[in-house]
Curated annotation (Swiss-Prot):
GO cellular component: cytoplasm; cytosol; histone methyltransferase complex; nucleus
Subunit (UniProt): Homodimer.
Major subcellular site: cytoplasm
EC number: 2.1.1.319
Modified residues (Asymmetric dimethylarginine): R501
Encoding gene per record: Art4
Protein name listed in UniProt: Histone-arginine methyltransferase CARMER
Domain (SAM-dependent MTase PRMT-type): residue spans on this chain: 141-450
Pfam families: PrmA, PRMT_C
Species this protein is from: Drosophila persimilis
Similarity comment: family membership: Belongs to the class I-like SAM-binding methyltransferase superfamily. Protein arginine N-methyltransferase family.
Length: 531
């Protein structure tokens, strides 16, 4: 291992102590290939000594080999995993089988060999599978961390003004909870929340990030000169070790419908590092559920499925797949936004208490429903949104994804019924929503609705992992039939009002048509929000 500058040594030592799978490098390594296993004959693998670059990966350690004389070009890349064969050879050498290559690594010092051996052993002989690994398919975890390793995806979240500004306001508005405190940032991503904690006066922030975004977070920490405040630790919170308990945990663990991606379980798991009476930001989440009526949305999905009802598509009969096509389209939750007036009853609220709920509580979430119907119509399904609260010592701050609040990158979610039900004002709609966690970091969502006092019911099971992103950016339209005045008369009344305001400009030479001045008219409110 090359002799590091004092600050580099400090960084590596801290990382090694906190997370054995952290990034590290070893220089001056001579790599030999085993030419004959029986005679133990070796040949030099590369001309000249090499540097081994080790970096954390969700599946183990990525080992990249470069020449000491040319670190720009990677000669070979391997994955050190739990099934990697390896053994110590003397005080400075280490034998390892990577893919089909049998290698002997001779290190520059005894210490380097010991450190590398610890890195390998921490992958090979780790503790049993972490809670995260037990509940998550390998392919799902790989895709998940790859997705959040892109700067573009971090940018998408950071540019959500409502999200980012609300977090900053909640943290800075409760500086007393952060001043001189130890903070844990779970799933830190770019580290933006860690920076907010430092702005609020935090003494130390441990920023945990399992994707490759950790390296970018480290760059931001160093370029902003806060490396003495923020320690970026690559890894999963379920697998890393911290040197101390923390006063506050911050995170942005919410997914679509609050629970998607199952990051909330990771957030709750992090409480093992929280001191008694410590703070959680956010503190609790409310999932809101309401029946809705939207003939346009239902018809859109139904007509898509009818593609498979063609009996002569280029001479081919597709009708045998119509039933499966219909099932697939209606298994998709719809991610978009809507006018809250499509909701037929006041929403039911299901609370998740981040300070007290257990991880297991989120494996099967059974939510009883009872709605007093406020308007007669056809119920096409259930609409979902969530609010989270930051309960601070100085003030409480809410982040809302309600259709009545400014739009966020979470939008809202709607689950359709394949068989809608007609229901009258004053009737009671009962049922349940069952969220059953799966190993794809999501949930199977079952909705079951029944009109009390009748035999009328409808149900559906949807795959929250496979939503339909319907949002187009177009303004939300008011539901049909909500105008209580003539929209035409409303328009012309507003035109007349604007015309009066612009009369002075016409007298000063402004052009007018039919008595309307050339001044700008704002008719959006009248069209989009009729009274």
């Amino acid at each position: 291992m090359s002799t590091p500058r004092p600050e580099e040594h400090q960084k590596f030592s801290a990382a090694a102590a906190l997370c054995p799978l952290s990034n590290c490098q070893f220089s001056g390594v001579v790599i030999s290939a085993i030419a004959d296993e029986q005679k133990l004959e070796f040949t030099n693998k590369y001309k000249g000594s090499c540097t081994l670059l080790c970096s954390y990966d969700s599946q183990g350690i990525v080992l990249r080999i470069v020449l000491d004389a040319d670190r720009e070009h990677v000669l070979k890349e391997y994955m050190i995993a739990a099934d990697t064969d390896a053994a110590q050879m003397g005080r400075r050498s280490y034998a390892v089988t990577l893919e089909s290559d049998n290698l002997v690594l001779r290190f520059a010092s005894d210490q380097d060999q010991q450190l590398f051996r610890k890195v390998v052993e921490n992958v090979k002989h780790l503790r049993p599978k972490s809670v995260f690994s037990q509940r998550t398919e390998e392919s799902s975890a790989s895709q998940y961390f790859q997705f959040y390793g892109y700067l573009s995806q971090q940018q998408n979240m950071m540019q959500d003004y409502v999200r980012t500004s609300t977090y900053q306001r909640a943290i800075l508005g409760n500086a007393v909870d952060f001043q001189d405190k130890i903070v844990l940032d779970v799933g830190a991503g770019s580290g933006i929340l860690s920076f907010f904690a430092v702005q609020a006066g935090a003494a130390k922030v441990y920023a945990i990030e399992a994707s490759n975004m950790a390296q970018y977070a480290q760059q931001l920490v160093e370029s902003n000169n806060v490396q003495h405040k923020i320690s970026v630790i690559p890894g999963k919170i379920e697998e890393i070790e911290l040197p101390e308990k923390v006063d506050v945990i911050i995170s942005e663990p919410m997914g679509y419908m609050l629970y998607n991606e199952r990051m909330l379980e990771t957030y709750l798991h992090a409480r093992k590092w929280l001191k008694p009476n410590g703070k959680m930001y956010p503190t609790h989440g409310d999932l809101h559920i309401a029946p809705f009526s939207d003939e346009s949305l239902y018809s859109e999905q139904y007509n898509k499925a009818n593609f498979w009802y063609q009996s002569a598509f280029h001479g081919v009969d597709l009708t045998t797949l119509h039933k499966e096509g219909m099932k697939e389209y209606f298994r998709q939750p719809i991610v978009d936004t809507f006018d809250i007036r499509i909701c037929m009853a006041k929403s039911v609220r299901h609370v998740c208490d981040f300070l007290n709920d257990k991880e297991d509580d989120l494996h099967l979430i059974d939510i009883p429903l009872e709605f007093q119907i406020l308007q007669t119509g056809i119920c096409h399904g259930l609409a979902f949104w969530f609010d989270v609260e930051f309960s601070g010592s100085s003030q409480n701050v809410w982040l809302s994804t309600s259709p009545t609040a400014p739009l966020t990158h979470w939008y809202q979610v709607r689950c359709l019924l394949p068989m809608p039900i007609f229901i009258k004002q004053g009737q009671t709609l009962t049922g349940r929503v069952l969220l059953e966690a799966n190993r794809r970091q999501s949930y199977d969502v079952t909705i079951d609705l029944h009109i009390e006092g009748t035999l009328i019911s409808s149900s559906n099971t949807l795959d929250l992992k496979n939503p339909y992103f319907r949002y187009t950016g177009a303004p939300v339209q008011a539901p049909p039939g909500t105008s209580t005045q003539s929209p035409s008369e409303q328009y012309w009344t507003q035109v007349d009002t604007q015309g009066s305001r612009n009369s002075s400009s016409m007298l000063n030479g402004g052009l007018g048509v039919n008595g309307i001045g050339d001044g700008s008219m704002d008719i959006t409110h009248g069209l989009m929000h009729p009274h």
